[in-house]
Amino acid sequence: MAHKAIHRFARISPRKVRPLADLVRGKYADEALDILRYQPHRGARLIEGVIRSALGNAQDPDQNPGRTINVDSLFVAEVKIDGGPMFKRIRPRARGMAYPILKRSSHITVTLEEV
C-alpha cells in the first residue's frame, strides 16, 4: 500500500530540489533521511520533512485500519518535484526599463511503499 505526503507551494525553485530528489529515490525511508540529513542544501530539509510526514501517515491507524506497518520496510517509491505558481516581480533597470523576476515555487510529493 502506498503512503503519500505532499508539500505544496514550497518557496524554492524546482531546479534546486530535483537533484536532491534523485539522491533518495528508490532508497529505504530511514536511509533517505540519513542521506538528506547531511546535505548542506535548503531543499534537503524540505524533502526530509515530507518523508517524515509520509512516515507519520503510514503509522496513522485512521488511514490503515487493522494493519500494523513496519516502518523499516518502507522505501521511497516516488519523489515528484513539480513547479508551483510563480510570483512575478520587477527589477528596475537603466533608462526607465524593467526586467522581470520570476520567484518560483515547488510542489514536493513523496510516496512510500512497503517492500
Where are these regions (language model features)?
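Structured, basic alpha/beta domains of bacterial-type, RNA-associated proteins
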Residues: 1-12, 18-23, 28-115
